[in-house]
Swiss-Prot record:
Low complexity bias: start-end ranges: 1-16
Pfam families: FAM110_C, FAM110_N
Region (Disordered): 1-83, 117-142, 186-244
Coiled-coil portions: none
Protein name listed in UniProt: Protein FAM110D
Cysteine-cysteine disulfides: none
Family in the record: Belongs to the FAM110 family.
Superkingdom classification of source: Eukaryota
Biased composition (Basic residues): 68-78
Organism: Bos taurus
Length: 270
């Protein structure tokens, strides 16, 4: 039984491109070794009329004892190694950020509230000690005015550097000593603080009549001492009460004036 060679195609079908190239190889190949050698295809299909014997070039067939793992029908894909690395890095970064935020919150709490021991000792001392004569006490007989209480800073807790900075309006210690530390004391912040006789308003604050505190505290003290003299004094004075916001604005204006006075004069570029 003779098999048809690749150079002689069968009569009933059209020769393929490979067969035509094999037949015309002598026209474009000069070496006889290359002409006599036939190149096998990369992937050989099933046994055909041109293959005298079957040859498995892709490896031995799988044994029946080791079946192939069937693919799961679910569309869920396994995560890639690089995605696992990115997920772990993101998780570690979030954990470190949360830890830093917790540390920062604890530091701020310690700065503004002090240590827990100081808070406990100050609360115990405030409950045992009577109220200071110049301090502010909440009225017990007026429950409807509880929502309108004036905010008074507590001075029992130890002051931190940030609190000293804000209490002294950001000024240097030398300038605070020159101006007088009593001007920046917490007692002067309350609504019942009144200017001392003989003191002049700071420079840059405007008229002397504007640098006045609320007359509510003075009216209360005068009313406790002398009856209706407080009402007569307030009617005779006729000055409006100064709010905390307006007082802070005047302090900022005064600080800005001090800064401009200390700095060199600026020339106008217009």
């Amino acid at each position: 039984m003779l098999l048809a060679s690749p150079s002689t195609p069968s009569r009933g079908r059209t020769p393929s491109a490979v067969e035509r190239l094999e037949a015309d190889k002598a026209k474009y190949v000069k070496t006889h070794q290359v002409i006599a050698r036939r190149q096998e295809p990369a992937l050989r299909g099933g046994p055909g009329p041109l293959t005298p014997h079957t040859c498995n070039e892709l490896g031995p067939p799988p044994s029946p004892r080791t079946p192939r793992p069937a693919r799961r029908g679910s569309g869920r894909r396994l995560p890639r190694p690089d995605s696992l690395i990115f997920y772990r890095q993101k998780r570690d970064c979030k954990a470190s950020v949360n830890k830093e935020n917790a540390k920062g919150q604890g530091l701020v709490r310690r700065l503004f509230l002090g240590s827990p021991r100081d808070v406990a000792s100050s609360s115990a001392g405030s409950s045992e000690r009577p109220a200071a004569p110049g301090g502010w006490t909440a009225p017990q007989d007026a429950p409807e005015a509880a929502g309108k209480r004036a905010l008074c800073p507590t001075c029992s807790l130890p002051l931190s550097e940030k609190e000293r900075f804000f209490n002294y309006c950001g000024l240097e210690r030398a300038l605070v000593e020159v101006l007088g530390a009593e001007r920046f004391s917490p007692q002067s912040w309350g609504a019942d603080a009144s200017p001392q006789p003989g003191t002049s308003p700071p420079p840059g604050s405007g008229d002397a009549s504007d640098w006045t505190s609320s007359e509510g505290g003075a009216d209360r003290r005068d009313g406790a001492e002398g009856g209706g003299s407080a009402a007569a004094g307030s009617e005779r004075d006729g000055r409006p009460q100064v709010s905390v916001v307006e007082r802070n604005a005047r302090v900022i204006q005064w600080l800005y004036g001090c800064q401009r006075a200390r700095g060199p004069p600026r020339e106008s570029e217009v």
